[in-house]
Design a protein with these regions (language model features):
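Acidic (Asp/Glu-rich) sequence patches and key acidic residues
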Residues: 1-184, 188-195
C-alpha cells in the first residue's frame, strides 16, 4: 500500500468518521470562525478520471525524504522548512500560519493545516534551487510524477541534460510533488491530504 498524497473531493470532505475528512472539516471550520474567516465549504465534487485533465491528484510517496529535508534547510528558513515538511492537510486558501487540529490525520494524533498559497512560493524556491526541468509532469492525476521519476524518464532526461535536479532524483521528486500539490489545490480549489 504505502502513503499517498491525494486530492479530496466534496463527498470525502464532508463524510464523518474513518471513511472521510468530516471531522477535520468541522474542526477546521471552527478554527476559521475563531479567526473571523468564513467556513470552507466550496469543495469540488469528485471528477470523472481523465488522464492528463488535472481534475484529480494522486501520487505515492516512495523514496526517502532525507535529501529533501536537507534541501529545505539549505534554501528555506527553519519555519518554512517545517511548514513544507510538516503539514498533513493542505487547503486552497490563505492562512495566517499553520492550524493544528485535534483530529487524527491517519499518521499522527493531530492534523496540521497549511494554506496552498503559502506553500506554493516555498515550493517554487525549491524548484528554482534544483532547476526542476519543464518536462516534469504538470498534471498528477494517477501517479504521473511517481511513474516519471521511478520508471526511467527522469533518469534519461538527467543523463541527456544534467542539472542539479538530476543529482538526486528522490529529492527532485519531492520538490515536484509539493510544487504540483500546491498548484493543484489552488487550481481546483480542493484540499490535499495523505492517505
Amino acid at each position: 500500500m504505502g502513503m499517498y498524497l491525494v486530492s479530496v473531493c466534496a463527498e470525502d470532505w464532508f463524510t464523518e468518521g474513518e471513511d472521510g475528512w468530516g471531522d477535520a472539516a468541522t474542526a477546521l471550520n471552527g478554527e476559521l470562525r475563531l479567526r473571523g474567516l468564513p467556513p470552507y465549504e466550496s469543495v469540488p465534487a469528485e471528477a470523472d478520471f481523465v488522464r492528463g485533465s488535472g481534475q484529480t491528484f494522486e501520487e505515492k510517496l516512495i523514496p526517502s525524504m532525507n535529501g529533501f529535508w536537507d534541501l529545505c534547510q539549505a534554501h528555506l528558513s527553519r519555519e518554512d522548512a517545517e511548514t513544507v515538511c510538516g503539514w498533513t492537510l493542505l487547503v486552497p486558501f490563505s492562512l495566517d500560519g499553520t492550524i493544528t487540529l485535534p483530529v487524527d490525520s491517519g499518521y499522527s494524533d493531530s492534523t496540521v493545516v497549511v494554506g496552498a498559497p503559502q506553500l506554493l512560493p516555498m515550493a517554487q524556491r525549491l524548484a528554482a534551487a534544483v532547476e526542476l526541468p519543464p518536462e516534469t509532469p504538470q498534471m498528477c492525476d494517477n501517479l504521473d510524477l511517481t511513474t516519471w521519476f521511478r520508471d526511467g524518464a527522469a533518469k534519461e532526461l538527467a543523463t541527456a541534460r544534467p542539472g542539479p535536479w538530476g543529482d538526486d532524483l528522490d529529492t527532485a521528486f519531492y520538490v515536484a510533488l509539493f510544487l504540483r500539490a500546491a498548484e493543484h489545490s489552488i487550481r481546483r480549489g480542493c484540499p490535499m491530504a495523505y492517505c
